[in-house]
């Protein structure tokens, strides 16, 4: 009988160890490339680069304006790689304004400063102080209203753009570097601690017609944060690892285009990107929406659904095993090269 109990304990220990190793080494339903074939509907096939789609905002004289972007690519400056988007989409001409948010959602967050920015309020000022999940809820609401108005392209819905989609619109197919006419397209007074955001569309647009891609508020992207820019075909980072998922901050996502570029050294020409905690609400961070294939938004929602909270002690164990695994992998590689 004692032998039977001991065998059961050993079996249970082995199963528990295997389960822990799977938890540590298997990343789950991670996605790094969007393999999407959007429906070839008439309104997509007939659209041309730069075509404008306008959506009525309930109880507002202003319209939400989006610009059509056909499939394209752009070079990654430092690495020499290229990033390619193989399907068309629409991106907001402006950052989402406070009026657009309030009319669609019925509320505006109470300004509670978490950083040194001053919150500037007004109908045409960019929306800020919103979390990642709240931005996705806003996109779902836009999709619902656009469908009711009969203007939603078949097979498409509103979502946050991926980092690559944002950068293609910013770069206009060229290198993702700061423009020579920076003062004409972006606000340059970030050094003033009392300065908040400005009304959208006050600066010149880029070559494809987008305003405030630099220099107003940071703009949230759909990607989970990664330390470097991705490249390749339809890249996206929906992989949870120790770089973007931690016990004290939760999920971290990417934001682009903020005014921190005024501190960038002269020899650093790439546009700024920042790590943003998904649950945070900052006066310096807002959003710009995109119309993307439904599959893209569904994949994001499905990925987020699988991000269940993990106890701190279990994450500590996971990190320990990851370190051991990385050490053993390096050690084995060294031995095989001898």
Give each language-model segment a name.
Residues 1-5:
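Short, small-residue-biased leader/transition segments that mark boundaries at the very start
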Residues 13-24:
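Hydrophobic membrane-insertion alpha-helices, especially the h-region
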Residues 28-44:
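Ser/Thr/Pro/Gly-rich low-complexity linker/stalk segments immediately outside membranes or between
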Residues 81, 194-196, 213-316:
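Surface-exposed recognition segments
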Residues 83-183, 222-233, 291-303, 309-314, ...:
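Active-site microenvironments of metalloenzymes and redox enzymes
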